[in-house]
Design a protein with these regions (language model features):
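C-terminal transmembrane helix and the adjacent membrane-cytosol boundary/short C-terminal tail
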Residues: 91, 148, 179, 183, ...
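Short cytoplasmic-facing helical segments at TM-TM junctions of multi-pass membrane proteins
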Residues: 99, 142, 146-184, 212
Length: 263
């Protein structure tokens, strides 16, 4: 096999399983083995997608969900990054913050929904708050972990060359912690959509989650499947975006350089 063919095969490999599942799904539906009352056929899902797209309803819900996700991630990610930096750079910061953050991290989002509705109602603030809360913790943990696992030899070497304070942070500590921070970004982006699903299915009047719950009330399983697939694709898009940022910001890192060479 030529190098070019092998390269294209490796790029297509992640899609073999999804395509195989869809083909099996279509075969089971067309032969009657899988009832449409249980799961609509892929053809029916595509028809529902085109119908929602043509009416513009799908894009309205998608735009609203995307806006909530981006705003919530921006707020929660920024707070998590800031708290992680404080806790990672300062022993006193860790003593003050870490225990409280870890306790809050273990509280399920579903348990907070009654309080969130009481505090914010069912407007946008409630959904954004839940998304921000969900994305805060992975950013905090990975930022703290990245700073605490920096090679101390590099820090001492930088200090011997006269770096200290902000210069030491910018040139040594932040670049050293960045790989772990980017892992936090990828994890937070995944939790962003998971949290939004919870928020939109319980306390919303718009968005992809609301579309799915509304379709469930009328037994429109094809629309429910469209919403599920959309969430999966949005999650994949967020992960691909995070990978692109990793490649762009970590070109200096030998591990990422080796990955690009293999790709």
């Amino acid at each position: 096999m030529s190098a070019i063919a092998q390269k294209w095969l490796l790029r297509a490999a992640p899609w073999f399983l999804p395509v195989g599942i869809v083909l099996f799904w279509q075969l089971a539906s067309s032969t009657g083995w899988l009832s449409s009352r249980i799961l609509p056929s892929p053809e029916g899902v595509v028809e529902a997608f085109w119908s929602l797209s043509a009416s513009g309803e799908l894009w309205q819900h998608l735009a609203i969900s995307s806006w909530r996700a981006v705003i919530g991630f921006s707020i929660g990610g920024s707070i998590g990054l800031t708290l992680g930096l404080i806790s990672g750079l300062s022993r006193w910061g860790e003593r003050l913050l870490d225990t409280s953050v870890q306790m809050l991290r273990n509280v399920p989002h579903l348990a907070l929904i009654p309080l969130v509705i009481l505090w914010f109602g069912i407007d946008e603030s409630a959904k954004i708050f839940l998304v921000a809360l969900g994305t805060l913790f992975p950013m905090y943990i990975n930022t703290w972990h990245g700073i605490r696992n920096i090679d101390r030899g590099l820090v001492e070497m930088a200090r011997s060359y006269g770096l200290s304070g902000f210069a030491l942070f910018i040139h040594v500590i932040l670049p050293g912690a960045l790989p772990s921070i980017m892992v936090g970004v990828r994890f937070a982006l995944g939790l962003m959509w998971l949290t939004l699903i919870v928020a939109e299915t319980i306390s919303a009047n718009s968005g992809i989650g609301y579309l799915a719950m509304n379709a469930r009330e009328f037994l429109q399983t094809d629309v429910v499947v469209v919403a599920i697939i959309l969430y999966a694709l949005l999650g994949k898009l967020a992960d691909v975006s995070a990978q692109w940022l990793e490649r762009s910001w970590l070109r200096w890192n030998p591990a990422y350089t080796a990955q690009e060479a293999k790709a």
